[in-house]
Swiss-Prot record:
Biological process (GO), any one: intracellular iron ion homeostasis
Family statement drawn from the similarity comment of this UniProt entry: Belongs to the bacterioferritin family.
UniProt entry keywords in alphabetical sequence: Iron, Iron storage, Metal-binding
UniProt xrefs under Gene3D superfamilies: 1.20.1260.10
MF annotations from Gene Ontology: ferric iron binding
Complexes and interactors: Oligomer consisting of two types of subunits: light chain and heavy chain.
Function in brief: May perform analogous functions in iron detoxification and storage to that of animal ferritins. Contains approximately 750 iron atoms per molecule.
Species, as recorded: Absidia spinosa
UniProt key word Magnesium: no
Record's protein name: Bacterioferritin light chain
Ferritin-like diiron domain location: 1-33
Statement: the UniProt record of this protein carries the keyword Isomerase: no
Length: 33
Protein backbone atom coordinates (compact mmCIF):
# COMPACT_ATOMS: atom_id res chain seq x y z
CA UNK A 1 0.00 0.00 0.00
CA UNK A 2 2.87 2.35 0.67
CA UNK A 3 3.92 2.14 -2.99
CA UNK A 4 0.37 2.91 -4.09
CA UNK A 5 0.28 5.99 -1.90
CA UNK A 6 3.46 7.24 -3.58
CA UNK A 7 1.94 6.70 -7.03
CA UNK A 8 -1.23 8.54 -6.01
CA UNK A 9 0.83 11.47 -4.73
CA UNK A 10 2.69 11.62 -8.05
CA UNK A 11 -0.55 11.53 -10.03
CA UNK A 12 -2.06 14.25 -7.85
CA UNK A 13 0.94 16.47 -8.54
CA UNK A 14 0.68 15.88 -12.29
CA UNK A 15 -3.05 16.62 -12.25
CA UNK A 16 -2.48 19.77 -10.21
CA UNK A 17 0.11 21.06 -12.68
CA UNK A 18 -2.15 20.28 -15.63
CA UNK A 19 -5.04 22.17 -14.03
CA UNK A 20 -2.79 25.16 -13.37
CA UNK A 21 -1.60 25.12 -16.98
CA UNK A 22 -5.18 24.99 -18.26
CA UNK A 23 -6.20 27.87 -15.97
CA UNK A 24 -3.27 29.97 -17.20
CA UNK A 25 -4.17 29.18 -20.81
CA UNK A 26 -7.79 30.30 -20.33
CA UNK A 27 -6.70 33.37 -18.39
CA UNK A 28 -4.37 34.49 -21.19
CA UNK A 29 -6.90 33.77 -23.92
CA UNK A 30 -9.53 35.83 -22.09
CA UNK A 31 -7.10 38.69 -21.52
CA UNK A 32 -6.36 38.82 -25.25
CA UNK A 33 -10.02 39.19 -26.22
Amino acid sequence: MKGNREVINQLNQVLYHHLCAINQYFLHSRMND
